[in-house]
Amino acid sequence: FPDARCAEIAATETPSGIVAVARKPAAAAAPAGNADCVLLDGVQDPGNVGTLLRTAAAAGIRQILLAPGCADPWAPKTLRAGQGAQFLLDIREGIDLAAFLEGYAGQGVVTRLDAPATL
């Protein structure tokens, strides 16, 4: 594949030179109410979402729930930051996190940028 053609069709400024076509994996029927998971709420930067997905995959967490308003986990910049982690994860988009947490039986750790205190 010529570099010029790759640069022409790439969605990023510095394409890696690798081109592939892949299907978006189907999510399971319903989020598990007790599995380890990462919940993302309001994370709008594609690079940050990709990094969080990559970190979750490295930690062995497979379920990722994104609230409305998060960056698209399948956007080119998110895929690049995720380095393929998306294909190891069960990613759910548009999740009502409050409703999910009502039935969640696992333990949780909450972090937020605007919290009044640190952990």
Question: Model-flagged regions — what are they?
Answer:
Residues P2-A7, V21, P25-P116:
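RNA substrate-binding interface of SAM-dependent RNA methyltransferases
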Residues E13:
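Glycine/small-residue-rich phosphate/adenosyl-binding loop
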